[in-house]
């Protein structure tokens, strides 16, 4: 009997950290609106605080624009990465390994380590702290790979630095 334990899916919750630059950008965009309210008259050219207002305005626009662009680029990169991996999985271009889980090492609940194991000499490693499209849920957080001896079929790909990214996990009983 075959039991699908994991299949690559787009998880919006993993995109949440990318929103941080967006909020930083919005905050800096509105700095020049806030500055005159805290320092009345500084938005007038003849006032003593005008230079501070101009600096706040330019810093707000520059940092805000940079943070917004960072948000857009990170989000686009995350979506494109998912689509590429999904296409590899859907077109059966993923590497397949089947066998028993060996040398299993669980990630501790403290999270200061990785979870890793081997199947037929192929090494897999992941951590809950990774923002990636692919399997990265350790057993201590409800992951599906829990112990040595599990008979699994895994579809994966190698990334640019040689890590094996898990796209699909099937338990064979």
PLM region descriptions:
Residues 85-95, 130:
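Hydrophobic alpha-helical transmembrane segments and immediately flanking/interface helices
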Residues 132-155:
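Short nucleic-acid-contacting surface segments enriched for D/E, G, S/T with interspersed K/R
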Residues 109-132:
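OB-fold (S1/OB) nucleic-acid-binding surfaces
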Residues 92-113:
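Structural detector for short beta-strands of small beta-barrel domains
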Residues 2-87:
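Alpha-helical transmembrane spans
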Residues 96, 147-153, 161-164:
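Extracytoplasmic
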Residues 155-173:
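OB-fold/S1-family single-stranded nucleic acid-binding modules
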């Amino acid at each position: 009997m075959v039991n699908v334990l994991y299949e690559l899916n787009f998880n919006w919750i993993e995109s949440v950290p990318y929103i941080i630059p967006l909020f930083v950008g919005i905050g800096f965009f509105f700095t020049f609106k806030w500055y005159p309210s805290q320092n009345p008259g500084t938005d007038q050219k003849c006032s003593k605080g005008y230079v501070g207002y101009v600096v706040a305005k330019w810093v707000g626009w520059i940092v805000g624009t940079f943070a917004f662009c960072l948000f857009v680029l990170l989000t686009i990169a995350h979506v494109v990465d998912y689509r590429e991996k999904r296409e590899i999985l859907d077109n059966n271009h993923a590497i397949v390994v089947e066998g028993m889980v060996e040398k299993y090492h669980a990630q501790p609940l403290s999270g200061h380590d990785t979870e890793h194991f081997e199947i037929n000499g192929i090494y897999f490693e992941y951590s809950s702290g990774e923002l990636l499209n692919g399997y990265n849920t350790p057993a201590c957080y409800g992951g599906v790979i829990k112990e040595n001896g599990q008979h699994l079929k895994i579809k994966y790909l190698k990334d640019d630095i040689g890590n094996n990214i898990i796209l699909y996990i099937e338990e064979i009983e």
